[in-house]
C-alpha cells in the first residue's frame, strides 16, 4: 500500500513518488540430511518508488517507474533477506475522467426595446390665434395629457415638445411663434411634475404641414385660417419608455 505524490512539470507531464509499505510472505525449501525442510516467514517492508507520467488524454496516461522494496524475508527463518528493485513501463486508465463539456455562457439578455410615444394637440385648442399663452381649455387638455404621460413614467425617458404653425406670416415670425408655443407647453408640464431636465421645446415653424396643397385655392383670409388649422399643432414625443 503506497501513497502517490505528483508534481506537474508541464501541462501533461508529471514527476511523482510513491511511499508506503508491502506485506510479504517468503517460503523456503531446503534439503537437509537427505530430507526436505520447508520454512516461511511474513512481514512488512518499506516501498519506495519514483517516476514520470505523461497524460495522453484525461483518462489515459503512460508512466516510467523505478520501485525499490527493502529487506524481503528473514535470514534467520528462510535463510535470506533480499532487496527488490524493479524498472517498469505501464499504461494507466482513469475512470470518470471524460473531458467536460465546454461551458456555454448564457446568452446576454436582450436590450430593452426603446419605444417612442406620439401625441398631437391642436394649437387652436391650446392658444388663441397668433398667441403663445395657454388658454384655460389648453390647460385642461394638458392636464389630461400629463395623466397619460405619468402612466408612461416619463421620468425614465425624454419628452420633446414640437411646435408648428401654418404658412400665414413670415418664416422668421412663424419660427419664433412655434418656439414660444412649444416652450409654453413645456413650462406647464414642468409645473405639473415632469423633471425640467427631461423635457425640451423645439419650434419647427411652418415646416411639415399636414394640409399639403389642400388650401392652395383658398383666397379669403378667414377661410384660409380655418383651412390651415391642422397645420397649427403641438406634437409631443415621449422617447425611451
UniProtKB/Swiss-Prot annotation:
InterPro entries: Bact_OuterMem_StrucFunc (IPR050330), OMP/PagP_b-brl (IPR011250), OMP_bac (IPR006664), OmpA (IPR002368), OmpA-like (IPR006665), OMPA-like_CS (IPR006690), OmpA-like_sf (IPR036737), OmpA-like_TM_dom (IPR000498). Residues 114-241 form the OmpA-like domain. CDD domains: OmpA_C-like. Disulfide bonds join 215-227. Belongs to the outer membrane OOP (TC 1.B.6) superfamily. OmpA family. With TolR probably plays a role in maintaining the position of the peptidoglycan cell wall in the periplasm. Acts as a porin with low permeability that allows slow penetration of small solutes; an internal gate slows down solute passage. This is Outer membrane protein A. It is a multi-pass membrane protein.
Amino acid at each position: 500500500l503506497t501513497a502517490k505524490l505528483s508534481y506537474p512539470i508541464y501541462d501533461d507531464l508529471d514527476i511523482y513518488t510513491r511511499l508506503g509499505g508491502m506485506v510479504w510472505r517468503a517460503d523456503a525449501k531446503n534439503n537437509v540430511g537427505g530430507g526436505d525442510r520447508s520454512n516461511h516467514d511474513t512481514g512488512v517492508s518499506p516501498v519506495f518508488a519514483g517516476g514520470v507520467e505523461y497524460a495522453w488524454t484525461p483518462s489515459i496516461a503512460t508512466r516510467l517507474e523505478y520501485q525499490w522494496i527493502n529487506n524481503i524475508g528473514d535470514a534467520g527463518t528462510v535463510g535470506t533477506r533480499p532487496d527488490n528493485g524493479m524498472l517498469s513501463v505501464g499504461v494507466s486508465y482513469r475512470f470518470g475522467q471524460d473531458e467536460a463539456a465546454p461551458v456555454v455562457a448564457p446568452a446576454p439578455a436582450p436590450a430593452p426595446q426603446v419605444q417612442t410615444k406620439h401625441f398631437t394637440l391642436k394649437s387652436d385648442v391650446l392658444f388663441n390665434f397668433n398667441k403663445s399663452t395657454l388658454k384655460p381649455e389648453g390647460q385642461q387638455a394638458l392636464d389630461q395629457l400629463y395623466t397619460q404621460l405619468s402612466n408612461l413614467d416619463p421620468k425614465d425617458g425624454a419628452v420633446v415638445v414640437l411646435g408648428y404653425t401654418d404658412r400665414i406670416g413670415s418664416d422668421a415670425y412663424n419660427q419664433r411663434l412655434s418656439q414660444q408655443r412649444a416652450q409654453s407647453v413645456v413650462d406647464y408640464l414642468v409645473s405639473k411634475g415632469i423633471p425640467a431636465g427631461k423635457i425640451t421645446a423645439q419650434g419647427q415653424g411652418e415646416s411639415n404641414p399636414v394640409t399639403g396643397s389642400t388650401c392652395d385655392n383658398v383666397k379669403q383670409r378667414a377661410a384660409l385660417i380655418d383651412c390651415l388649422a391642422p397645420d397649427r399643432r403641438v406634437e409631443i414625443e415621449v422617447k425611451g419608455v
